[in-house]
Amino acid sequence: MSVLALQEYEFERQFNEDEAIRWMQENWKKSFLFSALYAACILGGRHVMKQREKFELRKPLVLWSLTLAAFSIFGAIRTGGYMVNILMTKGLKQSVCDQSFYNGPVSKFWAYAFVLSKAPELGDTLFIVLRKQKLIFLHWYHHITVLLYSWYSYKDMVAGGGWFMTMNYLVHAVMYSYYALRAAGFKISRKFAMFITLTQITQMVMGCVVNYLVYLWMQQGQECPSHVQNIVWSSLMYLSYFVLFCQFFFEAYITKRKSNAAKKSQ
């Protein structure tokens, strides 16, 4: 089946990707401003909340998580279908190197929606601050760096972006659905939380693999449009995520389990 045979919705067909890419090329540096404001809000919010009782915010959190879950599920279905078709009809190299993900049917809207969504997703942290929950380094570091890198990369339509975005849509579809269920009061097995973290770790490994393939094909003189600077920043980002998520997995599920087992045996 041809990629062009994928059914487009009217809003996808009407989307002007040239205008979107042009806007990002002119405005991508605003991601630094958003990141600075985000950091300031975290520091200011935590300072203010020291003197206040925590907010419950259960219903707003359910609505927030459901909205992001629905967006991610729809995005995963649309971009996933597109990438599978590219992979099946044109092969692995084309699925990694082809820039059509940014301007082709179906995916062009979801590529732009993805990078824009990284700004409002910063709102995740607002719930942590207002509910006076533990805010770990991984959380805010991940939010800031994903925002900066996605805006920086979209403007250049770099190779590998289709896989980066599709993987993130898939992981977020599961993650935000889990958050919504937890916020709604459903009891979810701890193993499911472990599964989500493992999918995140897998995503980081795959991100590094994609970066390696892009670099390899570039060095071989094949058409795989990116630049070394982008590959370096992307690889450092994915490697840092890999280390931090592995550390989180070990501390949250391995160390804590051993600690609980030791307490029960006393």
Swiss-Prot record:
Q: What is its main location?
A: endoplasmic reticulum
Q: Which domain of life is it from?
A: Eukaryota
Residues of the signal peptide: none
One GO MF term attached to the UniProt entry: fatty acid elongase activity
Q: Which residues cross the membrane?
A: 32-49, 61-81, 109-129, 134-154, 157-177, 194-214, 231-251
* Activity regulation (record text): The reaction is stimulated by the presence of HSD17B12, the enzyme catalyzing the second step of the elongation cycle.
The protein's enzyme class: transferase
> What is catalysed by this protein?
a very-long-chain acyl-CoA + malonyl-CoA + H(+) = a very-long-chain 3-oxoacyl-CoA + CO2 + CoA; hexadecanoyl-CoA + malonyl-CoA + H(+) = 3-oxooctadecanoyl-CoA + CO2 + CoA; (9Z)-hexadecenoyl-CoA + malonyl-CoA + H(+) = 3-oxo-(11Z)-octadecenoyl-CoA + CO2 + CoA; dodecanoyl-CoA + malonyl-CoA + H(+) = 3-oxotetradecanoyl-CoA + CO2 + CoA
GO CC annotations on file: endoplasmic reticulum; endoplasmic reticulum membrane
Keywords from the named record = Endoplasmic reticulum, Fatty acid biosynthesis, Fatty acid metabolism, Glycoprotein, Lipid biosynthesis, Lipid metabolism, Membrane, Transferase, Transmembrane, Transmembrane helix
- Name this protein carries in UniProt: Very long chain fatty acid elongase 6
Q: What is the lineage of its organism?
A: Eukaryota, Metazoa, Chordata, Craniata, Vertebrata
Q: What gene name does this entry carry? A: elovl6
